[in-house]
Structures are given as C-alpha cells and as structure tokens.
C-alpha cells in the first residue's frame, strides 16, 4: 500500500513586526477601555510607519483612555527605544482619531429592553462566519508547523530581551516552517526560514562574516532549542536571513496595520478563516468572540478523543444572538463509530454560541489572569492561559455520545 506524502508550511512574525506592533497597540487600547467599562464597544485600528502612530476607530464607552501613553508603553515593551530604529517610543508622533460608534449598529447589538432572556439581549456585532480548529499534532492540539514557527520568533524575542547573548538582535523578525507528512503524521522538518532584524556589522567585519555569525547563533540558540532534534536531518534546509543584511526593519521598513496577520493569529493555514481580524475588537464582535468559542468547541471534541481533527464553522446575522448556522467536520477522523452529524447534534446543545453566553463563559469583558494585548503576538490559540483553551466540556461530550 503506497504511503501518502506531502509538505505543509506555516509562518509567524515577532512582536516587533510592524503589523503586530499595530495589533498590540489596538488591543492595549481595548484592554484599558474594557478595564474602565466592561460594556465598552470598541473597534480600534492602528497604523504605524516611520516615526508615526495613528490610532482610529469607533467607540461607545464610559471610559476615558490616554491613547498616547498606552501606545508609547506598548512600543517600549516591544523594544523600539532607540532613535536609530527610526521608530522610537519616546519620539514618535501619536495621533488619536477615535470617535463614537454608529447608533444604528449599537441599537442592533444592545437590545436590553426588548428581550426577556439576558443572553439574547446581545446580538452579533456583525454578520459573518468564523472558524475553530484543533488536531492531535501537538500537546496544545494545534498544527505543528504553526506552533514551531510561533516558538521560533518567541524565542528570538526572549533572547533579545534577556540581553545576555545575541545582543545585536532588533525587534522585527519572521519565521517559516515546512513539515513533511507521511500518512498524515509529521515525519520531519523539511525547511526552516528565520529572518531577524539586527544591528549593522561591527567595524572591520564584512557583511558576509556578520551574517555567518548571525546564522550560527540562530541555529544553535533558536532552531536547535525549539525544533526537536528527531525532526531535523541532513536534508533539512535552513534559510537564515536569506536576503542578507536586515538592519532596516519594523515600522520604518514596512508600514504596519491592525488585522493583517490573521493566519499567523489562528492556525497557520491549516484551517479555513472567515476573514475577520481579532485585535482592537471588543467581544461583542463575533469576528473575535465566536472564533474563540469555535476553537473551544473544536478543542474539546479532539481532547475528548472523538476525532483527531476538527473544524468548526459558526455564522451570524448582525443584531441576532443565535447563530445562523453551525457546521462541524472531523475530516474523516471521527472515532467510536461516530458521525459528524452525531457529534454536531450534541455539541450544539452543550456549547451555547450566543455572543452574551460566550462573553460570560470566558469572562471576555472582565479578563482575569490574561489580557487582550497578550493575544496580539504569537497566536490567539494553543496558549493555556486563555480561557477558550480550557477542556472542561470533555466529560460532558463523552457522556452525551456514550463514549467511555
């Protein structure tokens, strides 16, 4: 019997990537609005470029937020603190263009007087479809290529912030991992790409010599630490700063915008995406809250041993609390003789996917032990401190489906 063999690739970017700088500022602004007023309605977009930050969007809130202070704090935490970066927390301009939300939208989302059931009083903030996914490739029940890619850039940031080794590192970085699969199982890492911003070569050191130092350091201190040795072999291709010099980066090298890294934020291309970004959006926006809830459903189904893979789609109409549709696909991996229809029937009963129920279940308007800014770099999923990663519905699912 012939084996099925294929390659699959996912990428990630560091917290210093310009689009991620934007995401983190947007979510930090959201965090402060939510802290002051848990019922805030926020749609916050951020634009960053050479020496400039613009924060705009629509807000309905009782809170008052100092956008300048928040933006500079985030930029400082990321590490853009030197004038030579041409984007510096202390000297960049910060313009706030936040304004009030359309009352037409607000009327459809908050309907307190009209409806008796409080969980039906919050309608979806917009129409759209959202996806959740889980698989058995990693302990976090996430796709392996994405997890490795996220860990590579996260490790780079940790090394940079510790400041003990590789002191030439600057905040902007990207990673990409290609895995080889045989019969649906990860066999090996076929290729790794790491591009990191760095200081100019020291005086008397050629560009080629400097890149050789950087390549050696990244292989030893990043790739070999993150990627299991059993998955690396002599055929694995390692591309470190493949274009060579990477001194100019961050918002000076490329303009950043909120919501442009939606595949990095989710499943690395292993699952569909409804198209709606997360950062800067309060939890009444189902682009965010329903994507979190869909991951929760998929993860509990896989954690319960009902399937090895699970994709969940949910869709909404603006102003309507109940989902328009729910769809579950286990990609032929369902176990115990179960069908997708049987799993879906029970899941629809066990998981309440009305926006108000999602917000209440995960504490999305009163985060405890986490904040939205944390989600804005290194992925919204596969990180155990987020409440939508809990697997507390496993036993209920198994009981409902008569699975031991």
Swiss-Prot record:
Residues 101-111 are annotated as: Flexible loop. Binds 2 divalent ions per subunit. Binds 1 potassium ion per subunit. Transmembrane segments: none annotated. L-methionine binds at residues 58, 101, 254, 285. GO terms for biological process: one-carbon metabolic process; S-adenosylmethionine biosynthetic process. K(+) binds at residue 45. Its EC number is 2.5.1.6. Keywords: ATP-binding, Cytoplasm, Magnesium, Metal-binding, Nucleotide-binding, One-carbon metabolism, Potassium, Transferase. Pathway: Amino-acid biosynthesis; S-adenosyl-L-methionine biosynthesis; S-adenosyl-L-methionine from L-methionine: step 1/1. Residues 1-21 are annotated as: Disordered. Its cofactor is Mg(2+); K(+). Residues 1-13 have a biased composition (Polar residues). Mg(2+) binds at residue 19. It catalyses: L-methionine + ATP + H2O = S-adenosyl-L-methionine + phosphate + diphosphate. One of its GO terms (molecular function) is ATP binding. It is found in: Cytoplasm. Pfam families: S-AdoMet_synt_C, S-AdoMet_synt_M, S-AdoMet_synt_N. ATP binds at residues 17, 172-174, 245-246, 254, 260-261, 277, 281. GO terms for cellular component: cytoplasm. Belongs to the AdoMet synthase family. Homotetramer; dimer of dimers. Catalyzes the formation of S-adenosylmethionine (AdoMet) from methionine and ATP. The overall synthetic reaction is composed of two sequential steps, AdoMet formation and the subsequent tripolyphosphate hydrolysis which occurs prior to release of AdoMet from the enzyme. This is S-adenosylmethionine synthase. The gene is metK.
């Amino acid at each position: 019997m012939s084996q099925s063999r294929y390659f699959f690739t996912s990428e990630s970017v560091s917290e210093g990537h310009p689009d991620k700088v934007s995401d983190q500022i947007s979510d930090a602004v959201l965090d402060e609005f939510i802290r002051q007023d848990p019922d805030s309605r926020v749609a916050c977009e951020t634009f960053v470029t050479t020496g400039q930050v613009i924060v705009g969007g629509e807000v309905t809130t009782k809170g008052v937020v100092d956008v300048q202070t928040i933006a500079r704090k985030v930029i400082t935490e990321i590490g853009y603190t030197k004038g030579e970066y041409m984007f510096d927390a202390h000297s960049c301009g910060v313009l706030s263009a936040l304004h009030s939300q359309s009352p037409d939208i607000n009327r459809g989302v908050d309907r307190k007087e009209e409806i008796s059931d409080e969980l039906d009083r919050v309608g979806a903030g917009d129409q759209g479809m959202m996806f959740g996914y889980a698989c058995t490739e990693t302990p976090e029940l996430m796709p392996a290529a994405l997890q490795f890619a996220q860990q590579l850039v996260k490790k780079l940031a940790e090394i940079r912030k510790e400041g003990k080794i590789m002191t030439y590192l600057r905040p902007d970085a990207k990673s990409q991992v290609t895995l080889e699969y045989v019969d649906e199982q990860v066999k090996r890492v076929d290729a790794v790409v790491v591009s990191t911003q760095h200081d100019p070569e020291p005086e008397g050191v050629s560009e080629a010599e400097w890149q050789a130092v950087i390549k050696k350091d990244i292989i030893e201190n990043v790739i070999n630490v993150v990627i299991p040795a059993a998955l690396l072999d002599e055929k694995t291709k390692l591309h470190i700063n493949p274009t060579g010099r990477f001194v100019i980066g961050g918002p000076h090298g490329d303009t950043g915008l909120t919501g442009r890294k939606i595949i990095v934020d989710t499943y690395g291309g292993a699952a569909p995406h409804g198209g709606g970004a997360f950062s800067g959006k309060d939890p009444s926006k189902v682009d965010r809250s329903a994507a979190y809830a869909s991951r929760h459903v998929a993860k509990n189904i896989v954690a319960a041993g009902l399937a090895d893979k699970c994709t969940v789609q949910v869709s909404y109409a603006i102003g309507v609390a109940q989902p328009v549709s729910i769809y579950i696909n286990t990609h032929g991996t369902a176990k115990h003789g179960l069908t997708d229809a049987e799993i879906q029937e029970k899941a629809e009963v066990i998981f309440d996917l009305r926006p108000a129920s999602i917000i209440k279940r995960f504490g999305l308007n009163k985060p405890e032990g986490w904040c939205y800014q944390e989600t804005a770099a290194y992925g919204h999923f596969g990180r155990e401190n987020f409440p939508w990663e809990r697997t507390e519905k496993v036993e209920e699912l198994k009981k409902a489906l008569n699975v031991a």
